[in-house]
């Protein structure tokens, strides 16, 4: 990649909420707690899913991928935010900004695709239960996960290249907590209409295509569940999908408001808060949603804790 600004720009200033210094300490506390919970929660899901043989199923394989993604998602942004909240001079190096932009875009796109893959897994499990193990074999699961990651990172290469090749005007001040495409486009010295149109188009594709697949999957799932005679069977079927639906709703509702909403000066602070929610709060809530609503994960966690104490004895 030819990052044309690399030899000129050394660093960016991240404004965040610099005009409201009284918010810095509360945000520092919130970010620190959220990051700690995110690390602990997602590591717990990864360990439980990998170490408990009863959870070696496609559903938990994809959940492990989602937890790993959320770990990386927050780690690429939160540590830098914490440092800046504790500093008088809030900066990020040019190379750090490039890395943050690339990783943030890649993981965001990958998450959309993984959520669609997880809905397909639930569709097969509920609508084709007798053929589930045949259809969702290990090789297909690996291929679906790999395709999600590769597509997400390929999309990031494209968008990052388009954004970072634009000439940027001094002062290099980003009115945000992190390096995002919309914030960087505002620094450009040239017309960015074409870039904004491409960003909008790609965002629509990565939002609407996976969302359409999710909605189609759940339309078939709801139809299949309503045919189940017993109330207990219906409750169990809906229970396996409830956590996934909550996560999808959280992620899509916030991400759509950032990338598919037309820019407005009056909504810039709202955009910052929404970005913080889907970049920090949502990855923290995901493991809580899955563990609190999922009996198998809770039982697997208990077995893991019991094994740890047994080894210590």
Swiss-Prot record:
Going by the entry's taxonomy, the superkingdom of the source organism is recorded as Eukaryota
> Its principal location?
membrane
Residue ranges that the Swiss-Prot or TrEMBL entry lists as coiled coil: none
Residue numbers on the Cytoplasmic membrane side: 50-57, 121-139, 220-236, 293-313
List keywords of the entry alphabetically: Cell membrane, Disulfide bond, G-protein coupled receptor, Glycoprotein, Membrane, Olfaction, Receptor, Sensory transduction, Transducer, Transmembrane, Transmembrane helix
Determine if Signal is one of this entry's keywords.
no
**GO biological process assignments:** detection of chemical stimulus involved in sensory perception of smell
- The name of this protein is Olfactory receptor 2B6
Source species? Homo sapiens (Human)
């Amino acid at each position: 990649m030819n990052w044309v600004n690399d030899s000129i720009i050394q660093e960016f200033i991240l404004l965040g909420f610099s005009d409201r210094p009284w918010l810095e300490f509360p945000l520092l506390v919130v970010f620190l707690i959220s990051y700690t919970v995110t690390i602990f929660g997602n590591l717990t899901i990864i360990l439980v899913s990998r170490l408990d043989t009863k959870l070696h199923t496609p559903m938990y394989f994809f959940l492990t991928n989602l937890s790993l993604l959320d770990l990386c998602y927050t780690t690429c942004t939160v540590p830098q935010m914490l440092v800046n909240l504790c500093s008088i001079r809030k900066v990020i190096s040019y190379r750090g900004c490039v890395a943050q932009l690339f990783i943030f875009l890649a993981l965001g796109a990958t998450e959309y695709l993984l959520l669609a893959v997880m809905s397909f897994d639930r569709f097969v499990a509920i609508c084709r239960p007798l053929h589930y193990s045949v259809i969702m074999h290990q090789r297909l699961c690996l291929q679906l996960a790999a395709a999600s990651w590769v597509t997400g990172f390929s999309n990031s290469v494209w968008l990052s290249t388009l954004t970072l090749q634009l000439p940027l005007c001094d002062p290099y001040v980003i009115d945000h907590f992190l390096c995002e495409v919309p914030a960087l486009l505002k620094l450009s010295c040239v017309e960015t209409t074409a870039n904004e149109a491409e960003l909008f188009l790609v965002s629509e594709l990565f939002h609407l295509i996976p969302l359409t697949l999710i909605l189609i999957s759940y339309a078939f799932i709801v139809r299949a569940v309503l045919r189940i005679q017993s109330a207990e069977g219906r409750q169990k079927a809906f229970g396996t999908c409830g956590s996934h639906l909550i996560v999808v709703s959280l992620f899509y509702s916030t991400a759509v408001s950032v990338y598919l909403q037309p820019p407005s000066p009056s909504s810039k602070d709202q955009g910052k808060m929404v970005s913080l929610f889907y970049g920090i709060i949502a990855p923290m809530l995901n493991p809580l949603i899955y563990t609190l609503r999922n009996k198998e994960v809770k039982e697997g966690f208990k077995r893991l804790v019991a094994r740890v104490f047994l080894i210590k004895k």
